[in-house]
């Protein structure tokens, strides 16, 4: 087995890590940063991921997808999805199966398909660092993700060309990273994870058992639609209201203005973690008949805190519930670990300290701990690390609908996984020939108030009075938290089983088609990269030859100059088209036309009359071209100019 990488697939940012010996390496991406924005943009025929996608978001808001994780595994009619529709500039559409998808240029895309683009970027980042192909990964999800969301995350990995060996919960992964430096002794930790789109809290017991570190999750709780994006939205709403009050113009309908506001709000929020006040200054945010309008608003830290205090307070309920479910008191917590970028906000740290009665630890990197923990689990699965045992739990109660529409639990929340549990049921009517098993996940007593994961039928039950047939329903949850469910008629031995896939979710055929599409895109991406490289080569060659012609003007005949200039013109024309081979041919033609000139230059310089390799003239230019390929900041200079314009 090769390296199993760890990926934190975040709402706002993603991160990839690998275990090297007894240390975790957080891998820098091509731009040189350790985290990558979880943003995917569709521009012409190109798919941009990460920083390059983020840079062009202002000029391409409708086709730039961010916070896609909040839609993964969700139904279009979910209240939280309907709320999101009014908050994002891109279009959220209803798929044929009722799922929440997105629509780009008239084409519907599933959230796992979009997330796969981010995972591909993480995969490529790891491959570039390791110098070998990577096919296996541990991917993290919010602890409070339900079965549909976990399955959708695995689908995203599959589309990206990854075998997801394990799905683990983000707080658990962070505890693994924290425990790496804690070599001995037992402790109970609370992991408070407030990320870009989700909130989780887990109570985890770390024990030293015969030289092996055992991480046992006692309880977990959270909110899968509460995170930094909501803090941004609160600030954006305030800025929109201030502008409306000042200029009598509503910016809500202007997607370009809203995208600029989003960037400015995120920046202001971050600045206010260290500064007492900051200014949001957006010139030319819009215009009307009276001329251009500018948005200039000064925001204090106290104002931001008043706008978001309710959001921070919402995290306290799950903390209290997690402690109750774990059966421990606040005083039993030895350490509090903060995970997720939003925990850098002073108000969040203050409220957490007040709740737990102790200052949270500052020695765990909130942006990288989750990926580090995933890499540790990857090393455990590959056999590279043998002194760690992870015991996780299922976050939500699992059960089936019984008479009266009641949810009858089969597996209670916070049950350790993997696990298998069974319960015997019977028929509700005389001579009932079949039973329908409807599976739900959640904490409500009324079945249909919970998340329906799926349904299946057990048929051909022999005629019998009600209550007589014995039907055993078994739930089997694997280490990823994904279920297989079976129902068996104990009288006949007839059984029916399924791996739960909700009425929503991607079919196997859809996943396979998306894999094929991704492979086709990979071929297109390579073609695009090769074309960009040969264009860079052409540009560098033209520049070098023109400089040489100018420097040696007195040594070159008119015919030679004309021949070279014709070759340059033909190469410039070819470089504007998309024919890689034609550009190569025109490059060779320029080299041949320039050869007599290079021979004269060398002969005159006393270097002999063999002529020089024209490539030498633009070696530096070629090297610069190669650097451009590895650096999105240079490739996408046009985006940087747009950014400068709006400052």
Swiss-Prot record:
<comment type="similarity">
    <text>Belongs to the heat shock protein 70 family.</text>
</comment>
<comment type="function">
    <text>Acts as a chaperone.</text>
</comment>
<keyword id="KW-0143">Chaperone</keyword>
<feature type="compositionally biased region" description="Acidic residues">
    <location>
        <begin position="629"/>
        <end position="647"/>
    </location>
</feature>
<keyword id="KW-0067">ATP-binding</keyword>
<dbReference type="InterPro" id="IPR029047">
    <property type="entry name" value="HSP70_peptide-bd_sf"/>
</dbReference>
<dbReference type="GO" id="GO:0140662">
    <property type="term" value="F:ATP-dependent protein folding chaperone"/>
</dbReference>
<dbReference type="InterPro" id="IPR013126">
    <property type="entry name" value="Hsp_70_fam"/>
</dbReference>
<feature type="region of interest" description="Disordered">
    <location>
        <begin position="605"/>
        <end position="647"/>
    </location>
</feature>
<keyword id="KW-0547">Nucleotide-binding</keyword>
<dbReference type="InterPro" id="IPR029048">
    <property type="entry name" value="HSP70_C_sf"/>
</dbReference>
<dbReference type="InterPro" id="IPR018181">
    <property type="entry name" value="Heat_shock_70_CS"/>
</dbReference>
<keyword id="KW-0346">Stress response</keyword>
<protein>
    <recommendedName>
        <fullName>Chaperone protein DnaK</fullName>
    </recommendedName>
</protein>
<feature type="modified residue" description="Phosphothreonine; by autocatalysis">
    <location>
        <position position="198"/>
    </location>
</feature>
<dbReference type="GO" id="GO:0051082">
    <property type="term" value="F:unfolded protein binding"/>
</dbReference>
<keyword id="KW-0597">Phosphoprotein</keyword>
<dbReference type="InterPro" id="IPR012725">
    <property type="entry name" value="Chaperone_DnaK"/>
</dbReference>
<dbReference type="Pfam" id="PF00012">
    <property type="entry name" value="HSP70"/>
</dbReference>
<dbReference type="InterPro" id="IPR043129">
    <property type="entry name" value="ATPase_NBD"/>
</dbReference>
<feature type="compositionally biased region" description="Polar residues">
    <location>
        <begin position="615"/>
        <end position="628"/>
    </location>
</feature>
<dbReference type="GO" id="GO:0005524">
    <property type="term" value="F:ATP binding"/>
</dbReference>
